[in-house]
């Protein structure tokens, strides 16, 4: 965070900074650290040694541009060169060799892998170290445990049982005596007793059997190995057994790492050097000693809070990429060893480069990274729905992933907000559903200490000198440091009314909220936004909203679709500009100069005697099928300054974020069309393209070689197809640019050869061959057809040919989508709804000046949801629209005076009423409300209605992608019922409760059809088609449906036989014995 020259002013840090800093640390430190660990590969038989050096590695500039990598589905990467040495007998060779390619981060903070933008999000994990806890069992006896967590997530648990014996348990396996563990680690009994504070406790459970186990290190190792590896029988001590134990336990389970060593030293008051990153006998001894102190009352019962951020660490992009680089070097080591053996079989003289150059070896690095980006849960496809999404995605923190929690097993406490989150992790912004509380977002001022992995937050230091001079020094505090400070909240009323010495202010101290005297304050918050993420900081009047609705709002803003005509909000928070700039969707001038020319593809800039061409993005598809487009904003001949906006991206206006539209809304019921969150809209929003958005769909097809060895062919000459379907194809069989295509049209014509046997020829085919010598076509038509709902304009066709038989064709189709019934809209306060009806504008309710309303919301959606911020926003928006003003309001404006929001809104409405000479804008009897008229009758409504200008977004959940119907389709293999889901062409589920509803209406025949013919009655399903075609009566089958037979089989697996038979009029009188 940077200080400005102005007193108390500061700038918000760059929102993508965390990703860039992480990647820079990987390049500058991570690569060197892993290269230092690379061992010297020796072959003693042939006196050969191969070694890589950490110093002087180089990364070349990427060989392709970002755009070309996306266009050609390649990986944007850079070649890594490393110094290597090869000793071959008495010959020493030094050479700088290439060991492969590393993906490079681009200007968005993302990676391009196989043409797809991907991002690595930060993972938050329990920090390595030791954690103590004490809990009462069912008898009320206190059980104390200490858990040592390694850098790789392995656990060593120490516990004292009811008989006051101390046990160790490795990775939740069988428990083992602590004395055996310490002896196996190399300590004898005298050393143990001399270095503990409670030797008598150790001696109390030292019986003859225990003494025998630890009389020598070898016996202790054998005993430990038997328990650890769960091996029975008589073992004999050997070096190989010792090595296996060293590898499986001491190296994997006991590596603390740099962070773990610091935490261990701090918790147990040890002074072991930082470079000693493995668990030592001294650590286990001190941990056991502390545990005894806790159990027997001589120590303090200080349970560690596992959810406190001081006990968590962030694994950023640097750590994850470094781990993969280490993995790739391990594979490289094995590959080089194989190559060395091969060299001696061929009896050729090796060089450092020839050992690494073979194809499989040189691509090890890039394939390791491509596998990582493709399969690792924290390497996600970059969300490009709108500029806000692009900015926010890289600031996510997740507890999920390898070594972390899972959505199904995470406890409520691990999901909850913790006092240490303040100013570091947003208390609002998290996902809904099973992962609630497990994925969060960093607060806007938070930064990551990449050395220790902790999240830091900035505060103003209020020292005695600073109080005298009225200066403010900014300090960044980590979670373990801010416990010792009295922190005044920056959004409290008293801090902004001029501090008197005797005044009492609200503060935080040791995770508690207090009110204390101003003289006792050490630091204070720097900014009202400090506690929130970007999503939360874009909600105006957030302090008047319930947190659940604010959470929904911050998630829904990320789902807003960029509109064809963007508009910035009348009421905002002031963070819109920085969010738009940091998303990098706009083009910013990097130097000053003069515009030579500008069009939709590029801007030519003259600067310092040079002509610079700045390319623009024109109708490019995003990962979410939205349209990315840059519009030039500078005319020819204009002089520009450095930092000026040259072209605006989608959903930005004037350099500010513009996700929605300011529309006139009324809160009133209207004929039940806005019941339960439905929304009534005016046809003006359709005809004037207010909520029209562009979407780009991608369709692709690839040629292959059949099992008989013949290749598929892309062609326009496709027999048995109507000419109408082929009208848009060029002579190569690919759809033309600019064509308008409808559902079912052929986009790419393709034929797949088939081998037909003599017997399969029809009689006519034999005749044609005999008379004319013509071969009958044996190709199958496998063209790419436009699916349902895909109609639009072809804007791009890509032909990618890697060899003569491997051709990929991609067709991009632009769709223009107006708002329609079934689309989802939302405000910025969690007020979401589905369009239920589009009303002619003359039927919409209208204001006293004749203006028809654009949207009608249900007023019952406000009180129970407690998102009153929308009322403030709409009223202030109306005033701003009439006064031609825009407002930027920081949250918690009650810190200036009480009822500040209400006073601002009423004063602006009064001013608007006065200036426009419209008394209905502000009526003192019901301020904010107005009498409005029914558009159908012209009569005024009985009650005054709240009207205003709200900023409403159109979300990506659109009816075109949701609507679905099925006549017949695939069935499940086991139950023979229709499969589930739109993607699989699935059916509509009729569940138990739906059956009850139909039973309530007594519709027996409809119900029987639903449960048998339309579902899982195999024979009836086949015969109903025949009966329908020939107009016969649908037969009533007596055999059971498939689901009943599945039930019978499941009962048989439980050794229960269930038989059934039909009871009819003929066999109704049966004996009980027969049944």
UniProtKB/Swiss-Prot annotation:
InterPro entries: DNA-dir_RNA_pol_bsu_ext_1_sf, DNA-dir_RNA_pol_su2, DNA-dir_RNAP_su2_dom, DNA-dir_RNAP_su2_hyb_sf, RNA_pol_bsu_bac, RNA_pol_bsu_CS, RNA_pol_Rpb2_2, RNA_pol_Rpb2_2_sf. The keyword Nucleotidyltransferase applies. GO terms for cellular component: chloroplast; DNA-directed RNA polymerase complex; mitochondrion. SUPFAM superfamilies: beta and beta-prime subunits of DNA dependent RNA-polymerase (SSF64484). The keyword Nucleotidyltransferase applies. One of its GO terms (biological process) is DNA-templated transcription. One of its GO terms (molecular function) is DNA binding. Belongs to the RNA polymerase beta chain family. In plastids the minimal PEP RNA polymerase catalytic core is composed of four subunits: alpha, beta, beta', and beta''. When a (nuclear-encoded) sigma factor is associated with the core the holoenzyme is formed, which can initiate transcription. This is DNA-directed RNA polymerase subunit beta. It comes from Saccharum hybrid (Sugarcane). The lineage of its organism: Eukaryota, Viridiplantae, Streptophyta, Embryophyta, Tracheophyta. The gene is rpoB.
